[in-house]
Amino acid sequence: TKGELRQAILWQDLQPLLNQLGPGPLRVLDAGGGEGQTAVKVAEMGHHVTLCDLSAEMVARARQAAADKGVIDNMHFVQCAAQDIAQHLESPVDLILFHAVLEWVAEPQEMLRTLWSVLRPGGALSLMFYNANGLLMHNMVVGNFDYVQLGMPKKKKRTLSPDYPRSPQQVYGWLEEQGWRITGKTGVRVF
């Protein structure tokens, strides 16, 4: 499935990053962590993970997934917007997981500043976002030329398509302005 492919590619990059950050246990923040699939796997490696999500249902699912895997003691759960996580952390974290969230945030630069503020010096950010260029390419390949010419307006109010697909160059610029150093990039999928 697409989700399995995304996870496989993610872990191809994430595992070396975890190794590079140290033997652990690391303090990890999964900001907007949803059902906790990645957070639970990181906790299984012995790291201490704080997962935050705006949805009470997602936090409950993540908590259950952690309990099912026997890692609930390695995890802390916070129901809040990722923008508000700073007030819930006792100290800076070593690694931030921020996957499939930036494209839903109306003020992405402020969000990135918040994440920067909770990261320890020398820490890392794993960022995955919905690439607007991939959306464009997909629509061109399937022949949606009129839709592309209209600027690809969002068709429905309630869809799984994000509100703010991001241009990679714009995101890279925001990161560099904030002081982040980009050490790697991987395309996950187009279709």
Name these PLM-found stretches.
Residues 100-101:
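Short catalytic micro-motifs in class I SAM-dependent methyltransferases
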Residues 37, 41-84:
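Class I SAM-dependent methyltransferase SAM/SAH-binding core
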Residues 4-24:
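Conserved alpha-helix/loop element of class I SAM-dependent methyltransferases that forms part
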Residues 109-124:
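A short glycine-rich, Lys/Arg-flanked "PGG" loop and its adjoining helix->strand segment in the class I
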Residues 24-32, 124-151:
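Conserved class I S-adenosyl-L-methionine
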Residues 162-179, 185:
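Short alpha-helix
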Residues 97:
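A conserved beta-strand element that flanks and buttresses the S-adenosyl-L-methionine
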